[in-house]
A protein has these predicted regions:
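Short, solvent-exposed loop/turn segments in extracellular or other extracytoplasmic domains
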Residues: 98-106, 136
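Metal-dependent polysaccharide deacetylase catalytic core of the NodB/CE4 family, i.e.
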Residues: 150-162, 167-168, 172-177, 214-218, ...
């Protein structure tokens, strides 16, 4: 083949490849342009959607307590926050806002349980010209006192012993000693009859009006921190899945708890630091709290609470600081203004008294909550009357709830 023919063939091949490359580049350019168009369209859609008015809020519900209402609702599309409106029958006012689209609950802290309040929630979009969407259907918060406890028996025990131990009638009455089988029968009654035993934290929330519990609710407490409460009562509380609290005398807690040998009548029969830590770790429903560090001694014939200055009481509190106590039961059930002020300043949440023996009401002073003593001579019928809330001798005539019933 001549050189001219070879050159012509090569030229034709070169032109063919050139055309192929041009088509390939054109296809690539078209693909890039197509992607750009799609991306631009998506961006337009995103921008359009981000500027859209939020959808109507749905699923609004109100969980109503004595002094607060917690609202919950479903997340609304195109909303980046929410605004809450409240109407108490006279006017609608802005009650609050959420911080983000995922914040689909809000709590109204100033609720008056005597007044029905209606709420609505609207979604907001900070990028939209029309910032608020259509509000939710209204929901009305109504407090139904018949569904919840309005007074709670707080039972006060002291020493718990086994059935084999000999205890005089006077000891059961004045020493408030109760036998194991008697305590178990009481716990079994509560369990079998649908009672709720509250922790101190739960009672605190109830007292503040922030939580509700069934009418059949009770709190069970033990004073002095005798080790029989740990060895005898504590296993029963775990057996029946009950909550309880022990108020320990700080000076008696140093060291390790002794073996249970009540027949020796040893003086050092108290719950110790190791037992306090163990119970807190394995069964938090059984609280260990303060009965002061060392304020049971009477001075000059006065009751302990009236015998000490503010500084003396504060020093006693500081000695108990390593335990992290936040609740206290007053020695002998009595207290002074000095003592109440110290507890507030020391960061305690609540304190319990025995003066007088009434059911606990929300109207009780947070640092003078009433309790009812239970002794070894309290019959089962008496116990049932007390925990039912129907024993009239323990109704506080000064409590608002009782005053309303008397009218």
């Amino acid at each position: 083949m001549s050189d001219s023919r070879v050159d012509a063939k090569r030229e034709r091949l070169r032109q063919k490849n050139k055309r192929r490359n041009r088509k390939s580049r054109l296809k690539g350019l078209v693909a890039v342009l197509a992607v750009a168009v799609i991306a631009a369209a998506a961006l337009v859609i995103v921008i359009h959607n981000s500027n859209r008015t939020p959808d109507k809020v749905t699923g609004l519900t109100a969980d109503t307590c004595y002094s607060q209402v917690t609202l919950s609702w479903d997340k609304a599309q195109h909303a980046d926050s929410y605004v809450i409106y409240r109407n108490d029958g006279s006017e609608t006012v802005k009650a609050g806002e959420t911080e983000g689209a995922d914040s689909t609950s809000w709590t109204y802290e100033d609720y008056d349980h005597n007044t029905d309040v209606t709420f609505t929630v609207a979604g907001c979009n900070s990028k939209a010209h029309d910032k608020e969407g259509k509000p939710s259907d209204p929901v009305t918060a109504t407090y139904d006192s018949s569904k919840y406890a309005q007074k709670i028996p707080i039972l006060g025990y002291h020493k718990v012993v086994t059935d084999e131990e000999e205890v005089s009638e006077a000891g059961m009455k004045t020493g408030l000693i109760i036998k194991e089988s008697v305590l178990e029968s009481q716990l079994k009654y509560l369990k079998d009859n649908g009672y709720t035993t509250l922790t101190l934290d739960e009672f605190y929330e109830w007292h503040a009006g922030k939580k509700e519990f069934p009418p059949k609710s009770v709190v069970m407490t033990f004073d002095d921190g005798y080790y029989g409460v740990y060895y005898v009562a504590y296993p029963l509380f775990k057996k029946y899945d009950m909550a309880g609290a022990v108020f320990c005398i700080g000076k008696n807690t140093a060291g390790e708890i002794a073996e249970y040998t009540p027949e020796k009548d040893e003086k050092d029969q108290y719950i110790k630091e190791d037992a306090i830590q163990k119970v807190r770790e394995e069964y938090p429903k059984f609280a260990l709290e303060s009965h002061t560090f060392d304020m049971h001694n009477r001075v000059k014939g006065k009751k302990p609470a009236l015998s000490f200055t503010y500084d003396q009481i504060m020093e006693d509190c500081r000695k108990n600081e390593p335990f992290g106590f936040t609740y206290l039961a007053y020695p002998w059930g009595t207290y002074s203004e000095n003592m109440q002020n110290v507890l507030k300043d020391a960061g305690y949440k609540m304190a319990f008294a025995y003066n007088p023996y009434f059911y606990a009401y929300r109207s009780d002073d947070t640092f003078a909550v009433n309790r009812i003593k239970i002794s070894g001579l309290t019959s089962m019928d008496e116990f049932i009357d007390i925990v039912s809330g129907d024993d009239p001798q323990y109704n506080n005539p000064d409590a608002p709830e009782e005053a309303e019933k008397a009218q």
